[in-house]
């Protein structure tokens, strides 16, 4: 009986540590025209837009990340673009976990499309600790 209970507790903890992977509905937003940007400028524009305009309005994402001021990074070498249409992978990290977005910046039409690809939550460090163990 103890082994079954322990196995269930461990399974629950392991499932909690694994992130859920799913794609969200794309969110399309209007942005100023941005024709002629290079990869570095695209990364700067997408990061600024996400931090200043999107995350303050996206309550579910703030809740999932655990903050309204996530750390955001974009690897410039991963940006793909042609004819002023750019695909930009963006990663946001918060207190509760990470979230990856695929962003398409269409400089000609002045739109940016955010698709949340996945989220990974970090386990609560207090879960699973032996409450009877104290300082020695």
Swiss-Prot record:
Residues 117-136 are annotated as: Disordered. Coiled coil: none annotated. GO terms for cellular component: extracellular region. Keywords: Disulfide bond, Secreted, Signal. The keyword Zinc does not apply. Residues 1-23 form the signal peptide. Residues 30-117 form the YebF/Cmi domain. PROSITE patterns: YEBF_CMI (PS51979). It is found in: Secreted. InterPro entries: Uncharacterised_YebF (IPR020236), YebF/Cmi_sf (IPR038703), YebF/ColM_immunity (IPR025603). Disulfide bonds join 34-107. The keyword Metal-binding does not apply. It comes from the Bacteria. Belongs to the YebF family. This is Protein YebF. The lineage of its organism: Bacteria, Pseudomonadati, Pseudomonadota, Gammaproteobacteria, Enterobacterales. The gene is yebF.
């Amino acid at each position: 009986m103890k082994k079954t209970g322990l196995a269930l507790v461990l399974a629950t903890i392991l499932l909690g540590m694994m992130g859920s992977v799913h794609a969200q509905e794309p969110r399309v937003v209007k942005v100023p025209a941005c024709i002629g940007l290079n990869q570095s400028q695209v990364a700067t524009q997408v990061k600024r837009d996400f931090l200043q305009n999107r995350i303050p309005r996206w309550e579910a994402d703030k809740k999932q990340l655990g903050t309204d001021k996530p750390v955001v990074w974009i690897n410039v070498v991963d940006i793909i673009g042609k004819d002023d249409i750019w695909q930009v992978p963006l990663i946001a990290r918060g207190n509760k976990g990470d979230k990856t977005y695929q962003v398409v910046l269409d400089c000609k039409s002045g739109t940016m499309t955010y698709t949340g690809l996945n989220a990974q939550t970090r386990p609560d460090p207090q879960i699973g600790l032996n409450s009877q163990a104290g300082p020695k």
